[in-house]
Amino acid sequence: MPTCWILNESVSFVVALLWLAINIYLFIDTFCWYAEEESFFYTRVILGSALAWARASAVCLNFNCMLILLPVSRNFVSLVRGTSVCCRGPWRRQLDKNLKFHKLVAYGIAVNSVIHIVAHLFNLERYHLGQAKDAEGLLAALSKLGNAPNESYLNPVRTLYTGTTTQLLMTVSGITGLVISLALILIMTSSTEFIRQSSYELFWYTHHIFIFLFISLAIHGGGRIIRGQTPESLRLHNVTFCRDHFDEWQEAASCPVPQFSGKEPSAWKWTLGPVVLYACEIIIRFWRSHQEVVITKVVSHPSAVLELHMKKRDFKMAPGQYIFIQCPSISPLEWHPFTLTSAPQEDFFSVHIRASGDWTEALLKAFGAEGQAPSELCSMPRLAVDGPFGGSLADVFHYPVSVCIATGIGVTPFASLLKSVWYKCCESQSLPGLSKVYFYWICRDAAAFEWFADLLLSLETQMSEQGKAHLLSYHIYLTGWDEYQAIHIALHWDESLDVITGLKQKTFYGRPNWNEEFKQIAYNHPSSSIGVFFCGPKAMSKTLQKMCRLYSSSDPRGVHFYYNKENF
């Protein structure tokens, strides 16, 4: 089992461990520095350990904000992924988990934000207490600094009557801190699985609040509320000696009044690079959005599925890639990902879109999928296309044996792959490295098989004619049927062709027994590297991951299953 786990999860584990180690190092190093640094001794007299907690979490926040944009810069990720010299094997698969890393970094931002906010609430209260009438000793002396001419202050709360809320709303750091906190709350709460599934538009729009978050983060330190003793003051004012003689600061030449200043803002130094990279991403997206997209064909399929054929100048794709589509007449800001269902050999590119939210429902309606189709293609709404981008499914041809598994509309990326196989068979081209493809499709609605069955029938016929019938083994599972369909299936069971798909391979009813399927595949290919590719729900993904671990051999010469899941 350890060897099997290493095959699929080792790189992810190393990346997560490295990220965690850097966070821990930055936190501890910064915490110790602020807890011991002489220039912040007087600051610690007022604030105590909350100073170190606030500053340590701030550095970790800067680090994670530096990382958060990189995984979602899809042109950058696609560029790195396409550079095979720099990105091979498990590292290539790690790039396909970019959204998981994005979420991991987001959790880091959330945790450090809570620490930072709580620590600064303590700091504000300690500053306020420093101005209390019963404050005495060194605390009182430090809080009163700044009242006399040529004195710099240490305590930003200048009077006892300045409340915590007032202080927050009177400073740059306070206002930007509130903006950052509110932005994080909105982004985090709208990123839950429930919101993304039920209202993708809400998730999309709230995520763009990050613009205000990064602007506020860049100027957050401009208030310079946390102040330390200046280097010049430290040379003249010996803290070790003078802290016990604060009553003599005004008179004694050996203990002049300490001078303080705030540190320069540093968050922008951490985030400038990724922000510039993401700005380039937006510019590329804007440029692509203004390139003409010609819609050549529109097909309305059963089960509320819309098929669009399009053309775009200099558009080049590979099997298994995906694009982002924008429809300005529906929303000028929203971009939605869809896998390509066409093959590189075709003179167009296509997508199949299922109605599963407000935006997709509006798109189907705009293209007449509900029965009111525009009579002319020129009357169709304008679309903008960004991409294509590489995903995990593009690696199907990199394994000698590939297992492709889809549920429902998740079959769309495999349409491109199987079409590409079909074209290669038609042209009598070889498939270098690929000797066997197992295809599984699990669907609850028999009507959904309509558009895909034609492709499988063509592939089945062509492979038989080319003597390559052994290359593809497909298994279609129907999980939902009514009484009428059951009777119809029973009456035609003995026919040579399947009653639902029209294929020679009969449709299975129910769900696959994955233990038996993986056991048989492992038996058929005892010493092979097998790529398992999945597009579908999270629950089944966990099951398939488990199967890959269970049936991978601990012997380096045995069978090994490598799991790949499509993520947008």
Swiss-Prot record:
Cite the entry's keywords alphabetically. Cell membrane, Glycoprotein, Heme, Iron, Membrane, Metal-binding, Oxidoreductase, Transmembrane, Transmembrane helix
Q: Which cysteines are joined by disulfide bonds?
A: none
Co-factor(s): heme
Topology: which residues are Extracellular?
34-49, 125-167, 223-395
Principal location class: membrane
Q: What is a single molecular function from GO for this protein?
A: heme binding
Catalytic activity, per the record? Answer: NADPH + 2 O2 = 2 superoxide + NADP(+) + H(+)
Record's superkingdom?
Answer: Eukaryota
Q: Where in the cell is it found?
A: Cell membrane
Q: Report the top EC class in one word.
A: oxidoreductase
Activity control, as annotated, is: Activated by the ototoxic drug cisplatin. Activated by NOXO1. Cooperatively activated by NCF1 and NCF2 or NOXA1 in a phorbol 12-myristate 13-acetate (PMA)-dependent manner. Inhibited by diphenyleneiodonium chloride.
PROSITE patterns named among the record's database cross-references:
FAD_FR
**InterPro entries registered for this protein in UniProt:** Cyt_b245_heavy_chain, FAD-bd_8, FAD-bd_FR_type, Fe3_Rdtase_TM_dom, Fe_red_NAD-bd_6, FNR_nucleotide-bd, RBOH/FRE, Riboflavin_synthase-like_b-brl
Instruction: Give every Ferric oxidoreductase domain span.
Output: 55-284
Q: Name one Pfam family in it.
A: NAD_binding_6
Q: Which GO terms describe its biological process?
A: defense response; detection of gravity; otolith development; response to gravity; superoxide anion generation; temperature homeostasis
Q: Which Enzyme Commission number(s) are listed?
A: 1.6.3.-
Metal-binding as a keyword of this entry, yes or no, is yes
Glyco sites are at N238
What is its biological role?
A: NADPH oxidase that catalyzes the generation of superoxide from molecular oxygen utilizing NADPH as an electron donor, upon formation of a complex with CYBA/p22phox. Plays a role in the biogenesis of otoconia/otolith, which are crystalline structures of the inner ear involved in the perception of gravity.
Subunit-level organization: Forms a heterodimer with CYBA/p22phox which is essential for its activity and cell membrane localization.
Name assigned to this protein: NADPH oxidase 3
Species, as recorded = Rattus norvegicus (Rat)
